[in-house]
Design a protein with these regions (language model features):
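Short, cationic-aromatic polyanion-contact patches
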Residues: 4-17, 66-85
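Short Lys/Arg-enriched alpha/beta "domain-start" segment
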Residues: 81-131
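Long, contiguous binding/interaction regions
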Residues: 79, 86-87, 169, 181
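Charged, low-complexity intrinsically disordered regulatory/assembly segments
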Residues: 117-204
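Short amphipathic alpha-helical interface segments
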Residues: 14-30
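Short amphipathic alpha-helical interaction segments
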Residues: 42-57
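A short, conserved structural fragment
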Residues: 56-66
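Short acidic, hydrophobic short linear motifs in intrinsically disordered regions
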Residues: 28-40
Length: 204
């Protein structure tokens, strides 16, 4: 992994520091939580605290009220824009959202929240859509909600073994909360979920 990074003497970072930076870049995280990143990386809390302190001192991350933010300096440390494409992602659900619920409001209500065995990881924003990310308590599955205008897609990224049942349960825990947020106006409609090559359609 270290060969994907600039060998710049100005950065006094170790291998673990670089591994953390690689994950932050891989996930395109703009903000993240300590607890979520700890589970994502499987690191001891004290180890991660020391790493984040070094990254903060180097200007790669900054503390915020609701966790940490990733600064633009991370781009200075990259030779290219490496992303690991070998992960196992599965689309669990695609649905429409009420058009009269602003995306910003929905994101604000979801970010930082815990659902069942899902723990908040962080958020990425490409300007056209927002992706909110959670991780299971055991760090085995990452669940992502992609929100773009009136569309919602929920995906699972398997970091350990591929447990579809756990992923689907996590997906519906998240969808249930989103439905509650939308219920004053209109509930989420026409949800479909995918398992392998099969697709299923449900109605609200």
């Amino acid at each position: 992994m270290t060969d994907e990074w600039h060998d710049l003497p100005d950065f006094s970072l170790g291998e673990r520091d670089i591994d953390v930076l690689a994950v932050l870049r891989e996930e395109d995280l703009a903000t993240f939580s300590f607890e979520g990143l700890k589970r994502r990386l499987g690191l001891h809390p004290e180890t991660l605290s020391r790493i984040l302190l070094r990254l903060e001192q180097e200007g790669f991350v900054e503390k915020k009220i609701d966790g940490y933010g990733v600064t633009s300096r991370i781009n200075e440390f990259l030779r290219t824009n490496p992303k690991y494409n070998g992960d196992s992602r599965v689309t669990l659900l695609k649905t429409f959202l009420p058009s009269d619920i602003p995306v910003a409001r929905l994101v604000s209500d979801l970010r930082g929240r815990w659902f069942g065995f899902l723990r908040w990881l962080g958020l990425s924003d490409d300007g056209g859509s927002v992706t909110l990310k959670w991780i299971t308590e055991d760090g085995g599955i990452q669940v992502e909600a992609h929100i773009s205008e009136t569309a919602l897609t929920i995906e699972a990224k398997f970091l350990q073994e591929k447990n579809m049942n756990t992923a689907l349960k996590a997906c519906y825990q998240l969808l249930n909360h989103i439905s509650q947020l939308c219920s004053p106006l209109r509930r989420v409609q026409n949800a479909s979920y995918c398992s392998g090559s099969n697709a299923y359609l449900t109605s609200a």
